[in-house]
Amino acid sequence: MDKEKLEKEVIKLLSKKKKPLHFLQIAKALGLGKKERKTLKKVMRKLKKEGKVKVVKGKYEYTGEEVVTGTVIAYPGGFGFLEVEGGKDIYIPPFEMVKVFHGDVVKAKVTEFKGKKEVRIIKVLKRAKKDIVAKVVFEDEQCYVVPLDENAHHRILLSKKDCQKLKEGEVVVLKITQFPTKKSPARGKVIEVLGNPKEKFIAIDVIIRKYNLPTSYPEKVIKEVEAIPEEIPEEEIKRRRDLREQLCFTIDPEKAGDFDDAVAIELTPEGYYKLYVHIADVSYYVREGTETDKEAYKRGFTYYFPDRALHMLPEKLSAKLCSLRPNEDKLAFTVEMVFDESGNLKAYDIYESVIRSKARLTYNEALALIVGDPALEKKFPNLVEPLRMMETLYRILSRKRWEMGSIDFDLPEAEVIVDEYGEPTAIYPYERHVAHRIIEHFMISANETVALHLEHAGYPCLYRVHEPPDEEKVENLLEILEGLGYKVKRPHEYTPKFFQKIIEDFEGRPEENLVRFLTLRAMARAKYSPHNVGHFGLALEHYAHFTSPIRRYPDIIVHRLLKKALRGEEIDYEKTLAYLEEAGNHLSKQERIADEAEMEAIDYLKARYMKGRIGEEFIGIITGVVAFGFFVELEENLVEGLVKINTLTDDEYVFDEPAHRLVGVRTGKVFRLGDHVKVRCIAVDEERARVEFELIEKLEKHETL
């Protein structure tokens, strides 16, 4: 009898019996032999854990309840869902949500109401956080705060002492002193006043506190880093490959303060391309188990905002010791790769090195040298030839990856320019060109080679994995594309090539970026894992993150594993695998937090910026259609806003959900995904980072202002 069937039989037996039964009584009643009793033990443990049975004086009794453990996910309407690992999310009604906060881990009883499952919370096992960012409200001589996150369904009471110091509308950070129950609301103590959003721009500070991002380093870390010598020991240089005479250089954004990677190139006697990718050897300075290492692991990543960066590593490491600054001796980890004229990897070598970068180029300077800018050629005469050789190799590698099916999403991103006070002064699409692509492709090659080497060496690795997309999401994508008039021939299996072709078919069309975005949205999220399932988007069997150890902790882990593999060190494979499993989960979670915080910051800055442009006209593309209107993304600055359906006064419009469009009842006029429209900005809700437009006209052809 299999486990599932046995579980049902046990529940059936215990629910019929009025008295509790011993284990042997259950086994005998079900006619189980000695071998099957082992399975029964596992089943009873499972049922006990789930709360379906309880043990009373050594006997099992059916409780008639299903008890689950999960994480609370709050929604704006005051309701929530319990996220149960390995199971479906279960609805939490508003009267239960008053007891919990978003992210709390709870034990709950599953019940049914009107034929649908919902939960009743038994106990909070772990609180998500104790510090909350909230807005002050005065009402009926009472003072309370409303959280500015998923916990907005709570009203948190403050002491009279706190209330006397505060003003209506101020944003504060508070510590929860008394958690809510069904009968009494939460209480809190103000620990920081961020200010009034009407008087100064505090959105980034709010986001940093909301996500509990670190703004300073523990004293132990500061002291530890201060003690690191700035000079590289001579014995360390001697044991490494000395490449200080090599012509290598860095290419980075204009505002970059830390340089993870440097590149060099030469031709072999056979006419092949020998590419050197030098990566900052952060793991030399950040030793495993140190206070600095623990703090870097906890953070996981550097958090980037338009007006600041919260670095994973202290400045002495990130911007000085580790950074591959020009004309300074630096410790590096080098991946040396030889490619033929078709982009095939013919040979590679990986080793610890000492290098000396000869120049610090920006992406725009690199591009200017490639296309032949006389002034820059005069400034960097020795970089022209290697850069043009790099461009040739990039095009070879790009062609090779295209043949393999690599998907190039290449979505435009908004660059927000802020002044000294953090106020947005300009927003425009960030331009990516051939210099960006050169570095991108070289880094992909190094990352792939490192992952391949670790697997061949028999060592575990923290892979960067990207699973194939969920079929339901793909089907939704294809339905939308069909609404755009694209004829889809569904294959037996969805491969990277299939999605690559979709994007290629829309190249040069007005809907190109929209289709790239919709295709990306259908993809699974990439994550970190010791279990190699390949990288679907890049169409690679082996991939890891190795090239950005100053700003990503996963890369430091890979560096350490690689060093052990190169030295032939013995490792406890199972113990290492367990660590990588835990680290992969933690770092994937931290990456999501970084992405969400950074995107939210951009949204707030966009809203702040558009407040100064109310009344102006723009051209945009419809990126989403819903029952209450449609969303428009502006071409000029990638700001997205809503055109409400009740502002479309020329007709009565109905939502055609399958076709993702609004249709006029009398005129038959249609607004669908991909349509270009002229709109006017009419309102901005800064607090919720929302922009509202009104339609001026639908553009039949792609026009410009």
UniProtKB/Swiss-Prot annotation:
One of its GO terms (cellular component) is cytosol. It comes from the Bacteria. 3'-5' exoribonuclease that releases 5'-nucleoside monophosphates and is involved in maturation of structured RNAs. It is found in: Cytoplasm. Disulfide bonds: none annotated. It comes from Aquifex aeolicus (strain VF5). Belongs to the RNR ribonuclease family. RNase R subfamily. GO terms for molecular function: exoribonuclease II activity; RNA binding. It catalyses: Exonucleolytic cleavage in the 3'- to 5'-direction to yield nucleoside 5'-phosphates. NCBIfam families: 3_prime_RNase (TIGR00358), RNase_R (TIGR02063). Its EC number is 3.1.13.1. The keyword RNA-binding applies. Pfam families: CSD2, OB_RNB, RNB, S1. Residues 615-696 form the S1 motif domain. Its main location: cytoplasm. This is Ribonuclease R.
